[in-house]
Amino acid sequence: MGGPAYDCLTNPLGAVRFSFVNALSSGYDPASSVGKDWGVVDLFRHYFSDESAISQVPILDSSSIKWVQPKTLVRFRGMIQDMLGNEFYAGAYKDDSTWRTNKYSDVSQFPEGSSTEIQVWERRLLYCVPVPGKNQWTECSSQELKNRFLDLTGQNREKRVRVDEEMTDSMDSSTLEAGRNGSPFKKMKVGEATSSASESQVPQTSGIPPATSADSLPCLVKIYDSPESDLKLNDVVEFLGVLTFDPIVMMDTDTLDENSDALSEAESVQMPSGKVPRLHCLIHRKLETQHFLHGSSLLPEPKSPQIFKEIRESLMKYLTGLLGNDHIAAQFLLLHLLSKVHGRVDNVAVGKLSLNLIHLNKESMSIFGTQLSGALKSLLPFTQSIPLTIEYLNTASFGPKKDYGINRLMPGVLQIADGTHLILDETELQPGTLNSVGVENANLLKNLLECQKVEYDFQYYKMEMATDVQMLIFSEGKSNIMPADLVLPLQPSQVNSLEVITPETAETWRCYLATCKSLSHSIGQELQQVVENDLVAARQTDRSLGSQDLSRLLTMARMMSVSYGETTLSLEHWQMVLELERLRKERLK
């Protein structure tokens, strides 16, 4: 590691340069490396090898952008909304006989002169946004982190200036003097700061990006040394890297002059750093639900099912109260909340379990639907709601579409992250006619519900993207637009006042739900025969049962088991599923 002078948190570019010098002394050749990592990734992975170290790094959002300093280390947690291709940049240059690097910097600098050796490298551009539907409880309290971070930057400021001066002493004195009076460096990006970590050259972030809501700050992430297959569209990722952000700079393609290098990519130019901060990614990791829990902890391995049973009982009591003391509806709701796609066979998404609660009109929806929607926001990291009205279906853009005029993928309502819970409210639906847009949107919703896929329109062709979204439908009668896996009439017996839950209880339930969803599951050979016999008997009794119905029963059995913290199906839980299904069908008669 670079030592205190090159603290990876407050002076990451110093650590990059220091490791570059070490790599050169060990035989690293920039001329033949094509930008290959020289040890930076391992350095930062080692430095941030545990959650306590990672938690020291500020999370970049519309709040922290007001105080976090450019060229320091930040985290951005978001969804990859668009992949903008590759960008060329001058990654290394030779200053006299000494190699220097511009890697992990927005601006490529190198002394003027035809004899200068320059190595052009490549990096990928990802346009990332905060995860759609991300709920407020997932946000970390930033005030304490802000104070700690500003203390650290203050302590390291003098060290960084001193050490950077020592490094620049080795450069030609005339070059430095020219830099003070005129700038001997070519800038590949007009108006952006150079890559030096000297405090005197760090622009102060006194401004605020135009968009200031917590869910609106995007980020242009620049990826190095990572296989293209490692990251894909709609992945939820935590990027840890160097922030570059200048609210004063408002670049426009019309203002570019001859100093603008041809290597500047159009995508970057169209997203000025004053509006879209850049993050030069050093390391990254894909995020699961547990990473949004405070402390990133799951419940202990299910060595003691009693723990799961107790938490399950308390959560069931809460859900039952929300649903007007309808215990059966609460049971089905819990199974629905634990569902996830764990496999695909042909066009079938194995593990999905959509739920349609019926007998809800506008009045009852305003009570039970509103309470339930609010409760799910407090329990799940990502939740979205779609009003199924004729007007909305006819006007909204559900599917993402490629706009080749600006070379961007324009997001749609259904471009959401895996693990999102989606509520579809059909209680406001009135008779009317769907136009072509409405028909297309209805088909997109139906395909999402049945196959867990969303169609993306790339103009010249269309492509289906697999997803994993929990879908809960509220309607007065059985939905004709959304044929759910489970249809259940809601039968509340009373209206309960909304129970206030403590933060500790809410966190326990979140951990419980995340843990149960993460558990593996199997059916023992002995019980497998019992299940097969019961399914055969069920089909003989009701000839209308198809393979999808039988698959749904197995999915419910899986959810029932993991809800008790168990990874193997028991006879008791299988019989509970069969009884629940019997009660559901009784209600439908």
From Swiss-Prot:
UniProt keyword terms in alphabetical order: Cell cycle, Cell division, DNA replication, Mitosis, Nucleus
Chain intervals for the UniProt region annotation (Disordered): 163-211
Inducing stimuli: Expression is regulated by E2FA and E2FB.
Pfam families hit by this protein: MCM_bind (PF09739)
Biased composition (Polar residues): 193-207
A single GO cellular-component term on record: nucleus
Keyword Nucleus: yes
Cellular location(s): Nucleus
Disruption phenotype: Serrated leaves due to cell cycle inhibition and to a stringent late G2 cell cycle arrest. The leaf blade area is almost normal while the average abaxial pavement cell area increases significantly in the mutant plants, accompanied with a decrease in cell number per leaf. At the bolting stage, younger leaves display a slightly elongated and serrated leaf phenotype. In addition, the root growth rate of the mutant plants is significantly reduced.
A single BP term in Gene Ontology: sister chromatid cohesion
Quaternary assembly: Interacts with the MCM complex.
Function of the molecule: Associated component of the MCM complex that acts as a regulator of DNA replication. Binds to the MCM complex during late S phase and may act by promoting the disassembly of the MCM complex from chromatin. Required for sister chromatid cohesion.
Entry similarity comment: Belongs to the MCMBP family.
Protein name per UniProt: Mini-chromosome maintenance complex-binding protein
Higher taxonomy: Eukaryota, Viridiplantae, Streptophyta, Embryophyta, Tracheophyta
